[in-house]
């Protein structure tokens, strides 16, 4: 299988390294010439992707910000062979899916599937890419135009790269869930670390501090775009969180032992219930 990747940062670079290691042939490109050179040195790509060799691809993946999807994919579409699959790896889906729908009308011989590998690091760039980033990760698929045979083939391809499970959903549900499981976590971590006490934490912190602050480090350009793209769902989650925090604050300020105990027990019980369901 021949794979094309546009955008060779942390995600695109890691995916390329994983695919090359698994024995697939990877064609890749990046707007940054230095990144492309590093990708070749790190064995994230076998060949540089261009319109001359795009016809060899079985799968073409965009691993750039959602706002750039249309402009980076469009030049290659007319050169792809019949039955090729076009995917994206962006962190929000509604906007990209609408673009895919338009492209699918213009290119009826191609298949289009939105994708989101649920893996990442607090760092960015090809330098931080690894061939193990996706081990046991979940892969989310948002089919736009793909029959069951194509979807099964793509699922098996991702499983062969080390992904542990495949989730098929809609763009709307993807964005609703990601607002909670990913974007809200980054906002909370980023806001938490702004406490003046953070600069004095050395010697006073352990696992809980490290867990909560890991994703405070982020690519601010990318995350700004993702959060604003998903602003409706993220705003709802933030409002819920602020209301919940307000209850804790009130109980603590009022030294209301019973209320605080109830709040803490509620959170503990919800966590235990969720963990049991996961098993």
Label every model-predicted segment.
Residues 1-51, 59:
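NAD(P)+-binding Rossmann beta1-loop-alpha1 motif at the extreme N-terminus of oxidoreductases
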Residues 2, 25, 111, 138, ...:
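Residues at the starts of beta-strands that form the adenosine-phosphate
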Residues 51-80, 84-87, 91:
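Rossmann-like NAD(P)-binding element
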Residues 74-127:
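Rossmann-like NAD(P)(H) cofactor-binding subdomain of soluble oxidoreductases
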Residues 131-214:
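Internal alpha-helical scaffold of NAD(P)-dependent oxidoreductase catalytic cores
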Residues 200-270:
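Interdomain hinge/lid region at the active-site interface
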């Amino acid at each position: 299988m021949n794979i094309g990747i546009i955008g060779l940062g942390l995600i695109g670079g890691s995916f390329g390294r994983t695919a090359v290691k698994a024995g697939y042939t990877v064609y890749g490109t990046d707007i940054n010439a230095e990144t492309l050179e590093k990708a070749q040195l790190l064995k994230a790509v076998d060949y540089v992707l261009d319109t001359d060799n795009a016809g060899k691809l079985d799968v073409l993946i965009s691993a750039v910000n959602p706002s750039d999807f249309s402009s980076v994919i469009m030049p290659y579409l007319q050169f792809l062979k019949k039955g090729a699959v076009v995917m994206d790896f962006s962190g929000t889906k509604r906007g990209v899916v609408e673009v895919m729908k338009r492209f699918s009308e213009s290119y009826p011989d191609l298949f289009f599937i939105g994708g989101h590998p649920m893996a990442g690091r607090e760092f960015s760039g090809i330098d931080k890419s690894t061939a193990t980033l996706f081990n046991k990760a979940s892969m989310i698929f948002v089919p736009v135009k793909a029959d069951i045979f194509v979807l099964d083939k793509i699922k098996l391809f991702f499983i062969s790269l080390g992904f542990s499970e495949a989730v098929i959903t809609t763009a709307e549900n993807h964005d609703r869930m990601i607002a909670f499981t990913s974007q809200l976590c980054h906002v909370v971590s980023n806001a938490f670390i702004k406490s003046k006490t953070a600069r004095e934490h050395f010697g006073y912190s352990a696992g809980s501090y490290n867990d909560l602050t890991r994703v405070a480090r982020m690519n601010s350009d990318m995350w700004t775009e993702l959060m604003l793209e998903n602003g409706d769902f993220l705003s709802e989650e933030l409002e819920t969180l602020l209301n919940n925090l307000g209850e804790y604050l009130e109980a603590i300020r009022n030294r209301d032992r019973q209320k605080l105990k109830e709040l803490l027990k509620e959170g503990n019980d919800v966590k235990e219930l969720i963990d049991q369901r996961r098993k």
